């Protein structure tokens, strides 16, 4: 796969060169993009704010894989769902806020119009929510139909199936039932967010006691590691959080604590 990085030149910024390469205009909303054949990105050293360029590159490379696997027949929402899911990061707090606001109101896209949420978003929030809804479709598929359902849907698109054809073929239910299940899944996600938000803040001694009683509990260990980090016992925090991530590499709080310490190490 050809990878292109753009830097400032001839009075134009790196992002302007990248944008011109991708859309023929001096501005595009993102900093990295894939056509399915190449990956282009604004040079990380040319950005005003730090960016996880490895995360961006992985995301775009998944687009290359899924677009080529399906002969470019994959819907926009599904290639984004798989690309975001491959990053392996917890759902952003901003997305949780959008879910809390929009799911109860029923302000949602569905399989028929979700791709338009990227093409004609109308606002940054709508654009972010399109990503959020897309990856939650993938998570819903895994929970209800199993991990293999993701690759089965890819294969259906490879065989030139439309989404209307692919859903009953891959999942064994009609589209209405599939969408109903997705809506129920979103309700559960929102309930989980509210439950987390409603939990009272634990006192330091409670966190420590909970960890001492439940050292094999990844959440208890991650909370204690976060506490140790905050009181400057970074070596102890790192030992505990590394042990959690070794067994649970995608644990949200452990990943956050580990990343926070790495950022502080760089300062």
Model-identified regions with their sequence ranges:
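Juxtacatalytic substrate-recognition/specificity segment
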Residues: 1-75, 86-95, 101-108, 112, ...
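Acidic helix/loop microenvironments that form the catalytic cleft of cell-wall polysaccharide enzymes
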Residues: 80-88, 148-162
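Beta/coil-rich, acidic/histidine-enriched accessory regions frequently appended to metallopeptidases
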Residues: 123-129, 155-267
């Amino acid at each position: 796969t050809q990878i292109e990085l753009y830097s400032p030149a001839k009075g134009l910024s790196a992002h302007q060169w990248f944008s011109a390469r991708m859309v023929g205009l001096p501005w595009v909303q993102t900093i990295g993009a894939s056509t399915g054949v190449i990956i282009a990105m604004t040079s990380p050293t040319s950005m005003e704010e730090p960016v996880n360029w490895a995360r961006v590159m992985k995301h775009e490379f998944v687009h290359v894989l899924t677009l080529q696997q399906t002969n470019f027949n994959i819907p926009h929402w599904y290639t984004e769902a798989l690309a975001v899911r491959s990053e392996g990061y917890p759902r952003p707090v901003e997305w949780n806020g959008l879910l809390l606001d929009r799911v109860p109101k029923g302000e949602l896209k569905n399989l028929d119009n979700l791709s338009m949420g990227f093409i004609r978003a109308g606002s940054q929030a709508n654009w972010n929510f399109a990503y959020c809804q897309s990856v939650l479709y993938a998570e819903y598929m895994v929970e209800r139909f199993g991990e293999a359902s993701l690759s089965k849907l890819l294969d259906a698109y490879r065989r030139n199936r439309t989404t209307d054809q692919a859903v009953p073929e891959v999942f064994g239910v009609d589209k209405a039932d599939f969408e109903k299940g997705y809506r129920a899944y979103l309700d559960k996600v929102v309930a989980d967010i509210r439950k987390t938000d409603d939990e009272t803040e634990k006192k330091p001694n409670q966190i420590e006691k909970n960890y001492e009683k439940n050292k094999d509990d990844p959440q208890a260990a991650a909370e204690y590691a976060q506490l140790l980090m905050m009181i400057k016992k970074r070596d102890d925090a790192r030992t505990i959080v590394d042990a959690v991530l070794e067994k649970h590499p995608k644990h949200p709080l452990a990943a956050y604590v580990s990343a926070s310490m790495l950022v502080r190490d760089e300062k």
